[in-house]
Amino acid sequence: VLLHSPTYIGFTMSIENNGYRIVHSPLTRDADGVWRMDFDDMDRKIKENNIHVAVFCSPHNPCGRVWERWEIEQAMEVYRRNDCLVISDEIWSDLTLGNHQHIPTQSVSEDARNRTAAFYAPSKTFNLAGLIGSYHIIYNKYLRDRIGAKSSKSHYNEMNVLSMHALIGAYQPEGYAWLDELREVLTGNVDYACDFIVNHFDGVSCAKPEGTYMLFLDCSEWCQAHGVSL
């Protein structure tokens, strides 16, 4: 399974505990300090390891990138050329910062629409994680039937009445009004935190997240200066 690194530990545990092997394609920082996908590396890793499934995190956890349309289009073209199905985790899609906008993976092309299973939830944005209210959007009937068959193995893998109405309530106008205020507060917090870290901690850099409420710090210079190995 192709996975970008750094990665969310939940992906690692779920994939490995189900008997699959992870192949990482590292994200790299460009001259402006922005985390980017290495499309050539993705293509090479997929071919070398005969990979046919990839996990795509958008917005990215923990780097906080809200991928631009051209980036998603290019990634999906790599997956298309290699006949690679895509599991797109878009749980952070509502929680973008500043003027950044989330682009649904399935929206960039007809092929992306058909080879992608996209997963969403109000849990991160609206503090509803304990209510078990995630959902998927799958246009390809074959993929939808396969996932439905697997998820039916346990009757616990379903929404309950409380979680269903919590989801509906979160996606009402009042919920989005609250979300607008939350995004404004989080954007200010991120600006303050990143500026403070850069100005007070030598050797530690911080790429400002464009979404999520995660901060992913680069401490490599500090570690090298203090003889600490990574």
Pin down the residues of each PLM region.
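PLP-dependent class I/II
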Residues: 2-230
